[in-house]
Amino acid sequence: VAATTDDEKQDEAPAPAPAPRRRGRGPIATAVSVFGELLITAGLVLGLFVVYSLWWTNVIADREAHKQGNRVRDHWAAGPGSIDTKDGIGFLHVPAMGNGEVLVKAGTSHKILNDGVAGYYKDPIKSALPEDKEGNFTLAAHRDGHGAKFHKIDKIDKGDAIVFESRDKWYIYKVYAKLPETSKYNVKVLNPVPKESGAKKPGRYITLTTCTPVYTSRYRYVVWGELERIEKVDGKRTPPAELK
């Protein structure tokens, strides 16, 4: 009997079955895949936009506000001049918000407020200025993005101090009322005598306004204060007790 060699065994082994041919993806699967990729891309773009809106605009605005604030202080150091300067009229200090000093400029347009400052209203109801004998010093600032100078306005309570620093004087106001939510069209809160705050007669008031709820501009948050006293600025610009 002849021996069987390995080659003969291999010749007698069955051949492997051909690999099944892969079927291409159908139109529905392709569409779902493309849609998923678009969603991922949109999510990334949205995430970058949020970072830009809520962080990077703050960085840019704070730099610009600091630069403009330095110009105001340089102007003051140069000698006597009008309270209103090209770059701002002074600085707002609200200890309850914990954000240091906020430059105040004329106007409340986005072009003004986007520089990380507060602005006093020129319309629809013209703001009084701190040195006026009576009236309402009305201010607005962003709550989110672009410096977010009034982001913590909800931390202000009745009895808290609001201080405005001009070249020659410190104006110290005391908070007596707040309105956590009102229509963005409610301009009565800016009246010279803001009756919605409970005020009944002419005086020297201050009003802070910003958007609410946070990250929206649907409504307005309002805080009112009334002037308690005025202190002259000394040579060292020693702040009042409320800021120490």
Label for each model-derived stretch:
Residues 27-157, 165-244:
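Solvent-exposed, non-transmembrane regions of membrane-associated and secreted proteins
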